[in-house]
Amino acid sequence: MPLIYMNIMLAFTISLLGMLVYRSHLMSSLLCLEGMMLSLFIMTTLMTLNTHSLLANIVPITMLVFAACEAAVGLALLVSISNTYGLDYVHNLNLLQC
């Protein structure tokens, strides 16, 4: 396995561990989630380039679009919670339920 794939898998694993460790703060969770999505994007881009598949070229772009939508929704929740409560704790999200 080439070294670049191992580095990207290590970046994904570190982001996943960060997500598990810093799950009480929304900002830290969003940053770790973005790190995971970035490493997945790079991995799918490299796999698409190595397989020379023309039909799979849209997959990394679609993943990037979903990551941007996830970031927008996460930042909107972060702004809403920080304006209401002044904190970015995840347990404040439970108060938004119907």
UniProtKB/Swiss-Prot annotation:
Keywords: Electron transport, Membrane, Mitochondrion, Mitochondrion inner membrane, NAD, Respiratory chain, Translocase, Transmembrane, Transmembrane helix, Transport, Ubiquinone. It catalyses: a ubiquinone + NADH + 5 H(+)(in) = a ubiquinol + NAD(+) + 4 H(+)(out). Its EC number is 7.1.1.2. It comes from the Eukaryota. Disulfide bonds: none annotated. One of its GO terms (biological process) is ATP synthesis coupled electron transport. The chain crosses the membrane at residues 1-21, 29-49, 58-78. GO terms for molecular function: NADH dehydrogenase (ubiquinone) activity. It is an enzyme of class 7 (translocase). Its main location: mitochondrion. It is a multi-pass membrane protein. GO terms for cellular component: mitochondrial inner membrane; respiratory chain complex I. It is found in: Mitochondrion inner membrane. The keyword Nucleotidyltransferase does not apply. InterPro entries: NADH_UbQ_OxRdtase_chain4L/K, NUOK/Mnh_C1-like. Core subunit of respiratory chain NADH dehydrogenase (Complex I) which is composed of 45 different subunits. Belongs to the complex I subunit 4L family. Core subunit of the mitochondrial membrane respiratory chain NADH dehydrogenase (Complex I) which catalyzes electron transfer from NADH through the respiratory chain, using ubiquinone as an electron acceptor. Part of the enzyme membrane arm which is embedded in the lipid bilayer and involved in proton translocation. This is NADH-ubiquinone oxidoreductase chain 4L. It comes from Pan paniscus (Pygmy chimpanzee).
